[in-house]
Every structure is written in C-alpha cells, then in structure tokens.
C-alpha cells in the first residue's frame, strides 16, 4: 500500500471529524517487520481508539528471493500476530472474527458476508451473493460500461451453486467467526445428512475444530492456523 504512516494519520484526523464508524487495517508479516514496528502499531491503536480494527497476516505470493529473505519467519509472524491480539483485548476490543475486532459493535457488512447471507455487489470487481447464486463483476471500466449499455450483466464470474458447494462456502466463511457455525440454523437450509458428513470430516482427528452443542467452531490452534484448517473444506 503506497501511503506512509504520516499520510494515514493526516487522513484519519480528517475522517474522524465527519464519520464515527471507521476501520483501520494492519498487516502482519511484512518485510523488515520486527517487535519495534509492532509496538508502534499498537501505540497508534491505543492513541486513536478506532471503532473497528482488522489485523491480517501477509499472504506470500510470488515474491522474489531478495524480498523473501527480508520477510520475518513464520514463528516471528505468529508471535507478532498474537501480540496484536493480546494488545487489542487489553485495550477493550472484542474479537469476533479471525482478523477483526470492535469496541462497541461489529461490522454488519462483514457479518453478512461471513454468515454467507444475501448481499448485492455493484461496481467494478464487486461481488454479490443472492440465494445460491454468486457473481463477481469485471474489473475493466470500459468493459463494465459496454456491458451495461448493451443491457448485459457485467459479470466476470457467475455461478449458481449446488447444495454441497453452497454448504462448503457457508462453512468456509462462517467458521472464521469466533462463534463458529450454528448447525441447527444450517439444517433449515441444507440437508442434515450432508451437514453431519462435513462436520465429521472436520472434527475427526483434528486439533483445529471442535463441536460445542449445536455449534461448530475453530479451536484456538485452528484460529492460529486457519488457512491449513479450512483446507479440509477444499
């Protein structure tokens, strides 16, 4: 992201004069990141008290060898992430999703997305989900405008899911929530037999998932290694 900390602080001062629901994103695992950087980020949170905070772990993609050498180790990244988690809890934030915390209330938009409910996506690259139909719009502005002028949907991807695929997507997203999935609620939408099949697949011989009454959720270890844990749904 091209902005500096100074840029962010300047924009924040302007925004907080006009808006009350603001979110601040942090990324853990960046090149050259160390304990001092984490301390400064924590200090910013404590000073600004944003209503909502997101802390994401950097996804390693096609980094060249020079950049890869400057990345913190996996153990260091986990240590930094846990430090963020502890600092946010100490500061009065409530964690409601793997990477998201709030002071007074969670993001309703985020909850609708993670609970896999209906939402309409409008504009470039926007995604929507209605019933079992999921789509993503094209990212090219000229193509987007042309499709609309022709009376066509500007979708780059569009698919009506099967029951099994819709269930897998629902589990994949709602398991990111600290509360996990309400299995009884899922049974109103999906086959109970199909649900139990996936629950057994996730829970058996796994340190990552636990079933508590009618809820299925990630364990503390599963939250820390969510990418690996949720691969069982792929």
Task: Give residue ranges: language-model regions.
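Conserved non-cysteine loop/helix-boundary elements of the Radical SAM core domain that shape
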Residues: 1-89
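Conserved, mostly hydrophobic/aromatic
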Residues: 25, 45, 53, 96, ...
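Flexible glycine/acidic-rich beta-alpha junction loops that bind and position SAM and/or redox cofactors
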Residues: 28-35, 50-73, 95-111, 125-135, ...
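Short glycine-aromatic motifs
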Residues: 88-94, 209
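Self-splicing inteins and homing endonuclease
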Residues: 103-104, 116, 213-216
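Hydrophobic, secondary-structure "cap" segments at the distal end of domains
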Residues: 111-115, 123-206, 210
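Short, amphipathic alpha-helical interaction segments positioned at domain boundaries
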Residues: 221-234
């Amino acid at each position: 992201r091209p902005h500096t900390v100074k840029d962010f602080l300047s924009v924040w001062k302007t925004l907080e004069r006009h808006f009350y629901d603001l979110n601040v994103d942090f990324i853990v695992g960046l090149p050259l990141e160390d304990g001092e950087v984490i301390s400064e980020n924590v200090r910013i949170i404590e000073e600004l008290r944003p209503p909502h905070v997101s802390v994401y772990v950097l996804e390693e993609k096609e980094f060249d060898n020079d950049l890869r050498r400057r990345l913190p180790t996996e153990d260091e990244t986990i240590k930094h992430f846990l430090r963020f988690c502890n600092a946010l809890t100490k500061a009065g934030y409530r964690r409601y999703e793997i990477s998201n915390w709030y002071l007074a209330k969670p993001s309703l938009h985020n909850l609708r997305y993670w609970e896999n409910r209906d939402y309409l996506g409008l504009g470039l690259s926007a995604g929507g989900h209605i019933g079992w139909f999921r789509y993503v719009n094209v990212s090219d502005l000229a193509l987007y405008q042309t499709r609309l002028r022709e009376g066509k949907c500007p979708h780059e991807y569009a698919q009506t899911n099967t029951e099994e695929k819709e269930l897998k997507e629902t589990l994949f997203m709602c398991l990111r929530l600290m509360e996990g999935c309400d299995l009884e609620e899922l049974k109103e939408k999906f086959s109970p037999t199909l649900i139990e099949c996936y629950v057994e697949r996730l829970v058996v011989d796994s340190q990552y998932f636990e079933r508590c009454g009618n809820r299925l959720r990630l364990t503390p270890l599963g939250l820390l290694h969510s990418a690996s844990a949720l691969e069982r749904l792929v």
